[in-house]
Swiss-Prot record:
ATP binds at G25, P26, T27, A28, S29, G30, K31, S32. Pfam families: IPPT. It catalyses: adenosine(37) in tRNA + dimethylallyl diphosphate = N(6)-dimethylallyladenosine(37) in tRNA + diphosphate. It comes from Rhodopseudomonas palustris (strain ATCC BAA-98 / CGA009). This is tRNA dimethylallyltransferase. One of its GO terms (molecular function) is ATP binding.
Length: 321
């Protein structure tokens, strides 16, 4: 298995307490258990770094920590956002900055855990300075998307921002709409904004960063069994309550793994068994993409197998054995 060492000047090399511990990994890899164990052992606070677990409407289908688990150590940024909100990476960084300040003021160790690579990249590399898109521009683009279709929007993007149009898949509704919104609102292509970044909240040299990398086949089997357990635990009722709100299907919460398939089942389009199969398959594909993304985008994260987790814990906090 490919591994990568953390930066040579990281805090663990100097025997000092890190500014934070970052625990990433694919879905269902055991991140939450590792973070909770570390929080209990080190006096830490667990901070969510997952783009779907921020939504209060989706505790079960996103595998958020249970109330019993949350009672064992302080948790932050879980279930704090309504599903009607398009919660951006910029909004996350702002919320994370406040959470980090609170945790540090209390003298606790921040433990950031999740599978959203963009959030970790924004925290450790800085965030692109894309300004907020006015609501009227966003609404106009989405109206055109619904009325004219994604191909028409892609053609318009090719005229406004040829580089983005060439880079994006012609059927990628969300990213095409986003790129068009930015160029229409600012007069500048998205790539221009991406070249400008804010200072990172958590410079790589100040943190310990780990990526849990379990055996692929074992992970995929765990994903399948966990999705079945979610259904038994009330995921269908949770999604039904979300569907009743009739929110914009392009909102992030409406695209959480399993949600679209279960909504199709609730509409009578597919059976529950088919919905479960689709939801589990989508989650497996996402896990595969997480491996690839972190390997190429954040090589400074140290890759460890879950069974190496205890040894990892002993290296994080100086003096802990």
């Amino acid at each position: 298995m490919a591994t990568s060492d953390m930066t040579a000047e990281g805090p663990e090399r100097h025997g000092r307490r890190p500014a934070a511990v970052l625990i990433a990994g694919p879905t269902a890899s055991g991140k939450s258990a590792l973070a909770l164990k570390l929080a209990q052992a080190s006096g830490g606070t667990v901070i969510n770094t997952d783009s779907m677990q921020v939504y209060r409407d989706l505790r079960i289908i996103t595998a958020r920590p249970t109330p019993d688990e949350e009672a064992l150590a302080p948790h932050r940024l879980y279930g704090t956002v309504d599903a009607a909100v398009n919660f951006s990476a910029g909004a996350y960084v702002e919320a994370a900055a406040a959470a980090l300040a609170e945790v540090r003021a209390a003298g606790r160790l921040p433990i950031l855990i999740g599978g959203t690579g963009l959030y970790f990249k924004a925290l450790t590399r800085g965030l692109s300075a894309v300004p907020p898109v006015p609501a009227e521009v966003r609404d106009a683009v989405r109206l055109r998307l619904d009325r004219d279709g994604v191909q028409a929007l892609h053609a318009e993007l090719a005229r406004q921002d040829p580089e983005a149009a060439a880079r994006l898949a012609p059927a990628d509704r969300t990213r095409i709409a986003r790129a068009l919104e930015v160029v229409l609102a600012t007069g500048r292509p998205l790539a221009d904004w991406h070249q400008q970044t804010s200072p990172p909240l958590l410079p790589p040299d100040d943190v310990v960063a780990v990526f849990l990398a379990p055996d692929r086949e074992a992970l995929y089997a765990r994903i399948d069994s966990r999705f079945a357990a979610m259904l038994q635990g009330g995921a269908l009722d949770e999604v039904a309550a979300l569907a009743e709100r009739q929110l914009d299907p392009l909102l992030p919460a409406m695209k959480a793994h399993g949600v679209p398939a279960l909504i199709r089942h609730l509409r009578g389009e597919i059976t529950l068994e088919e919905a479960a199969s689709i939801g589990a398959a989508d989650t497996r594909h996402y896990a595969k993409r997480q491996f690839t993304w972190f390997r190429h985008q954040l090589p400074e994260f140290k890759w460890v197998r879950p069974e190496e987790a205890d040894a990892f814990l002993n290296t994080v906090i100086p003096g802990r054995a």
